[in-house]
Amino acid sequence: MSDRIYLTRDGYNRLKEELYVLIHQTRKEVLEKIAEARSHGDLSENAEYDAAREQQSQTEARIADLENKLSTATILDPKLIKTDKVYILTSVKLKNLQVEDEVIEYTLVSSEEADTDLGKISVRSPVGRSLIGKTVGDKVHITVPKGELHFEILDIFVK
């Protein structure tokens, strides 16, 4: 049994598009590579064949993973997200208590939608886990691989 995942509509559509490309494009390309490698004869020492089979295995595993995620996904409507506490899909403005005048903003999302370059962090990350359920004014102390982080929650909102 799979864990339910929570996605935005955009996140769901991105995963669906990736699945479509894997099934209708990548899978066919890999089968063509396998057929081409087979045409070269002896498969026992055929690195091209082995590489194509490995790519096929990875492609099929990703297809199965995406099908599972999409079948268990719950699409969240940002308009229905409360901002009294930090929840998935809320954005938080944090004051770094270790660096003067540093304010950081994160949006908490599922692991599938996390993108630190865009300020989207997973609710399963150390920072995400520490923020869930907190309210404005709470001070949060987080242990991460690089040490300790200390923040104060300044604002909770939905983008």
Swiss-Prot record:
Annotated family: Belongs to the GreA/GreB family.
InterPro entries: GreA/GreB_C_sf, TF_GreA/GreB_CS, Tscrpt_elong_fac_GreA, Tscrpt_elong_fac_GreA/B, Tscrpt_elong_fac_GreA/B_C, Tscrpt_elong_fac_GreA/B_fam, Tscrpt_elong_fac_GreA/B_N, Tscrpt_elong_fac_GreA/B_N_sf
Organism domain of life: Bacteria
GO biological process: DNA-templated transcription elongation; regulation of DNA-templated transcription elongation
Molecular function (Gene Ontology), one example: RNA polymerase binding
UniProt keyword terms in alphabetical order: Coiled coil, DNA-binding, Transcription, Transcription regulation
Pfam families according to UniProt: GreA_GreB, GreA_GreB_N
Function: Necessary for efficient RNA polymerase transcription elongation past template-encoded arresting sites. The arresting sites in DNA have the property of trapping a certain fraction of elongating RNA polymerases that pass through, resulting in locked ternary complexes. Cleavage of the nascent transcript by cleavage factors such as GreA or GreB allows the resumption of elongation from the new 3'terminus. GreA releases sequences of 2 to 3 nucleotides.
Transmembrane segments: none
Keyword Cytoplasm found: no
Disulfide bridges in this chain: none
Ranges in a coiled coil: 44-75
Protein name as catalogued: Transcription elongation factor GreA
Underlying gene: greA
